[in-house]
Regions:
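Cyclophilin-like peptidyl-prolyl cis-trans isomerases
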Residues: 1-149
Length: 149
């Protein structure tokens, strides 16, 4: 079976992410469900920190929201948080990931084994690099459409 991909169509172009169910099957299933339901369509990157990461997936754009689905059990794994890695955001409680995720701009080893890695950018990282910066950005970049193939 071919690797499944998540495509985030941004205003500037497509970001193609290789999904990693071998690392985090529950998290990958959630991402696929939400993308299939159109949950991510129109959602912004509400927290974009240069040299660190771009975070999105909050339906209200504040960083405080999530889907109506139950929070996920942590699936911390050995994959390192390096440039292009996609990982799930959460509160200080390990089992609180829901819909928000982040994409690393740079290596962030202090996150390793504390956040669930579920994918890696295969192409289009330049579009993540170009997202407006800020917490939140004055004019945040957004996901036009998220699709799984």
């Amino acid at each position: 079976m071919a690797d499944e991909k998540l495509t985030l169509s941004l205003e500037s172009g497509d970001v193609v992410i290789k999904l990693r169910p071998d690392l985090a099957p529950g998290h990958v299933e959630r991402i696929k469900e939400l993308a299939g339901e159109g949950f991510y369509d129109g959602v912004t990157f509400h927290r974009v920190i240069p040299g660190f990461m771009a975070q999105g997936g909050c339906p209200d754009g504040t960083g405080m929201g999530g889907s109506k689905k139950p929070d996920l059990q942590a699936e911390f794994n050995d994959a390192p948080h390096v440039r292009g890695v996609c990982s799930m955001a959460r509160t200080s409680y390990p089992h609180s990931a829901n819909s928000q995720f982040f994409i690393c701009f740079d290596d962030a080893p202090f996150l390793d084994k504390q956040y669930t890695v579920w994918g890696e950018v295969e192409s289009g990282m330049e579009h993540i690099d170009a997202l407006p910066k800020g917490e939140p950005p004055a004019s945040p970049g957004k996901i036009v459409k998220a699709t799984v193939s």
